[in-house]
Amino acid sequence: MAGNRNNDMNVYCSFCGKSQDEVKKIIAGNGVFICNECVALSQEIIKEELAEEVLADLAEVPKPKELLEILNQYVVGQDRAKRALAVAVYNHYKRVSYTESSDDDVDLQKSNILMIGPTGSGKTFLAQTLAKSLNVPFAIADATSLTEAGYVGEDVENILLKLIQAADYNVERAERGIIYVDEIDKIAKKGENVSITRDVSGEGVQQALLKIIEGTVASVPPQGGRKHPNQEMIQINTKNILFIVGGAFDGIEDLVKQRLGEKVIGFGQTSRKIDDNASYMQEIISEDIQKFGLIPEFIGRLPVVAALELLTAEDLVRILTEPRNALVKQYQTLLSYDGVELEFDQDALLAIADKAIERKTGARGLRSIIEETMLDIMFEIPSQEDVTKVRITKAAVEGTDKPVLETA
């Protein structure tokens, strides 16, 4: 309510003491008055304090080098991809912090991330590790389970519900989280020509994902499933959610070779080395991704492309032993609870890596191979109190002999 100007009583600002004749406007409250100049000054003070809070928030976000150091503790290899992710994630949260406090004319757009790499190269684990290091909610979705609205399957909004659930239904916290969408290459258009039939899980899903990736206020059913009339919805703004999408994109290196003018190797010809194909993955540009089947609008919302390389046997052995949560360390800890020491021969580790490569499962297949090798041991050991040490040999991994047991 504005203070009334009258001839009988002059109104003064309770903060600066100026009269209503000295300012443009005085607003009256419960026994107090404030002028337009003090309102403007208050806004400026609040803005400065918010900016200081933002700088404090940003100080808590690890710098790119610090993020890389964290990733190096858990993820073996993929140095180029880790650098790209560290920079992209830091810039994203820097953008979020400044956008929330600044009214600058410059609109800082979101830089979502596309990770391209073979199965088991560490795409999902990289995204998980980043979210954990930043202490933000994290959700994983499988693109192949998604359909556009009106078809049997999972609506894209259900991805947001997973993030809200990960944030314990704290929507404000969820709005600064990370979503990883896997198998994104599986919803690529099957060829560049538009199909006459309806594309339920291809271009339509890309269009649906596009809306939430670029930033929108989405209505999410609190219990998941399809939307129904008169159903109470959770409103969530996706403009500050970081989307990381990943896929194997099998065969995309051939598109890169074609673009670069090189002949694609056919049947019966000598194949290029894996290292050569790995270097082609670093040459991927948006044109190649579009030819693979992602629509231009969708690609445009994924400006950061991180290409992951096929893991070698040496990489897999390092994954087994070096990270803080390495599988060998985990199984050694498990057996230590039974008072038993666990040791892997070097050639046994290499045999595990070779099996994973043979099965084309990469790092994600390592645990199942160890489980197969150690099943009988883990069954028997708790009942054999005289066993003090178990040694896993190459023969044990290959199934031609049993692990070596040492007794007291």
From Swiss-Prot:
Residues 1-54 form the ClpX-type ZB domain. Keywords: ATP-binding, Chaperone, Metal-binding, Nucleotide-binding, Zinc. InterPro entries: AAA+_ATPase (IPR003593), ATP-dep_Clp_protease_ClpX (IPR050052), ATPase_AAA_core (IPR003959), Clp_ATPase_C (IPR019489), Clp_protease_ATP-bd_su_ClpX (IPR004487), ClpX_bact (IPR046425), P-loop_NTPase (IPR027417), Znf_CppX_C4 (IPR010603). PROSITE patterns: CLPX_ZB (PS51902). Transmembrane segments: none annotated. The keyword Nucleotide-binding applies. Belongs to the ClpX chaperone family. This is ATP-dependent Clp protease ATP-binding subunit ClpX. It comes from Streptococcus agalactiae serotype V (strain ATCC BAA-611 / 2603 V/R).
